[in-house]
Design a protein with these regions (language model features):
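N-terminal signal-anchor transmembrane alpha helix
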Residues: 15-38
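Interfacial helix-loop-helix junctions of multi-pass membrane proteins
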Residues: 38-48, 117-137
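Perimembrane loop-to-helix junctions flanking transmembrane segments
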Residues: 45-62
Length: 167
């Protein structure tokens, strides 16, 4: 004999889980973009390229391993985000609309850029977006891009048709 449960309305815990799921997923996607596009495709920098200049095979190996750990961390953020999104829906329709989810993703990605830009580029200076001429412009541009995503993400999450962060 099978029983069916009555669908229940989403509670505030579902909304918080969904919000944090989108933010963590955005953190992971931001990290993947940085690692895949800037580290691998464009080869502008590695995670530790200002500490271990990738001019020798040994230093390139160290940077590649560090990049691998960086990718593993972004993968964990992505998995946490997916798990929280799943938990927030509990097999039902999502408690928010698509714009709110896009807002949470942008907010998470912007949070990644802000943390990466302030900590790794400015505070620790373990690498820069694109070392060399105009290095400061690339670093500032990265921060501005992150701030724009934070603002747009926040606005999208706060829109009436997108749900409310206050839930």
């Amino acid at each position: 004999m099978t029983t069916t449960q009555e669908p229940r309305p989403h509670d505030s815990a579902d909304l918080r889980s969904w919000l944090w799921g989108g933010v963590f997923l955005g953190l992971g996607l931001g990290g993947f973009f940085d690692g895949i596009v800037l580290h691998q495709i464009l080869q502008w920098h590695h995670l530790l390229s200002e500490v271990y200049l990738p001019t020798t095979l040994e230093n390139l190996r160290i940077n590649t391993v560090a990049d691998g750990f960086f990718h593993a961390a972004t993968w964990v953020f992505t998995l946490i985000g997916l798990a929280l999104l799943w938990r927030g829906t509990r097999g039902q329709h999502a408690p928010w609309g698509t714009p709110a989810l896009i807002g949470a993703l942008l907010f998470g990605w912007g949070l990644f850029n802000a943390a990466e830009g302030l900590v790794n580029h400015q505070l620790l200076q373990i690498h820069h977006v694109r070392p060399g001429p105009n290095q400061v412009l690339y670093d500032v541009g990265f921060l501005v891009w992150g701030a724009a995503m934070l603002i747009v993400g926040w606005v999208l999450m706060r829109r009436p048709w997108g749900g409310s962060v206050r839930a």
